[in-house]
């Protein structure tokens, strides 16, 4: 369009110039030929730049330059279209055989496209010529609420009529389309349920004999045994039975955090809760640490108090028991840009870099001998990790050997309540 307009302007200019001459037709023809020659030279230069000359005999005097330029332009468009079609074909082929069901639909639910897994997963027949609505395919009411919900922080898990667990996610594909991805997680759910059942059975089967054993040990301890070796043996058995009881409690606590869907979130003063742990730290402080609390007062949290208490106390307990002797430990609870930050800092022995990625794994210990001496179970940081997942947070660990460690996490603003009982924005 721009070229046509330029050509019209040039013709008009040639007419105007020719009007001021004695022979209009002659001068108009001359000017028109000059314009055509100028365009011809420019087109030739363009072709030379694009290196489209097929042989060395091609010259400036050769005609057909215009058609070659136009052909090149069309050829480039054709190549781009072919490349796009090949890419779309490859993507379509890859998506078609993915193990997940993929559905592209409009905002009203009308399906525009789906891969071969979707009809198998949701038991429907799809044809491009027949209009199908996603709410007739995934007909569960909770999916409809999830589909139209503006905030989708987590995938939706559906229990279908044939007892299959389907995890569904929806994302805006573009301004007109919605991308729905569904995955069958039945085997994963059954595996988690089996593990939970196994852990519950282990917990129950160990707790009963442990209670009996502790009862008999208490009777023996009350008999005023004079033999020092026997007294030492009974004290050691009592200590180990208490350690086993603590391990079972942590085991059970971790299992509940992982599997319970009811979060039981309530408003509570977390600043006061952290301050209440001062007495416990004094009792646990057998290595004469200098423990400093820097707590911002009156911070109200919407969350599970017992779980957060366990997470905070585990971090403090680890610093006291594993940082070394006579260290400076600082416990911070202050506002930050993202929300509220809890941080436990010490200048103790530190941790080697290769251990840091594994610290939140169950039963992982940096030093087995030291953990047995201090009574560590290897479950404390795993409890912290799974507790923080409920607040969309994570445990940040920084440590340098011989210089100390820092264990911190941030509670996001949406879980923090201001003094007028509103979420901090």
Swiss-Prot record:
Lineage: superkingdom: Bacteria
TM region positions: 15-35
Alphabetical keyword list: ATP-binding, Cell inner membrane, Cell membrane, Kinase, Membrane, Nucleotide-binding, Phosphate transport, Phosphoprotein, Transferase, Transmembrane, Transmembrane helix, Transport, Two-component regulatory system
The EC number(s) this enzyme carries: 2.7.13.3
Record-level GO cellular component terms: plasma membrane
Top enzyme class: transferase
Membrane topology listed for this record: Single-pass membrane protein
Gene Ontology annotations of biological process type: cellular response to phosphate starvation; phosphate ion transport
Compartments it resides in: Cell inner membrane
Pfam families (UniProt xref): HATPase_c (PF02518), HisKA (PF00512)
GO function term, MF aspect, one: phosphorelay sensor kinase activity
The reaction(s) this protein catalyses: ATP + protein L-histidine = ADP + protein N-phospho-L-histidine
PAS domain ranges (all copies): 89-156
Modified residues (Phosphohistidine): 204
Domain Histidine kinase residues, every copy: 201-415
Gene3D superfamilies registered for this protein in UniProt: 1.10.287.130, Histidine kinase-like ATPase, C-terminal domain
Keyword Coiled coil in annotation: no
Entry keyword Cell inner membrane: yes
PANTHER family xrefs: PHOSPHATE REGULON SENSOR PROTEIN PHOR (PTHR45453:SF1)
Functional note: Member of the two-component regulatory system PhoR/PhoB involved in the phosphate regulon genes expression. PhoR may function as a membrane-associated protein kinase that phosphorylates PhoB in response to environmental signals.
Record protein name field: Phosphate regulon sensor protein PhoR
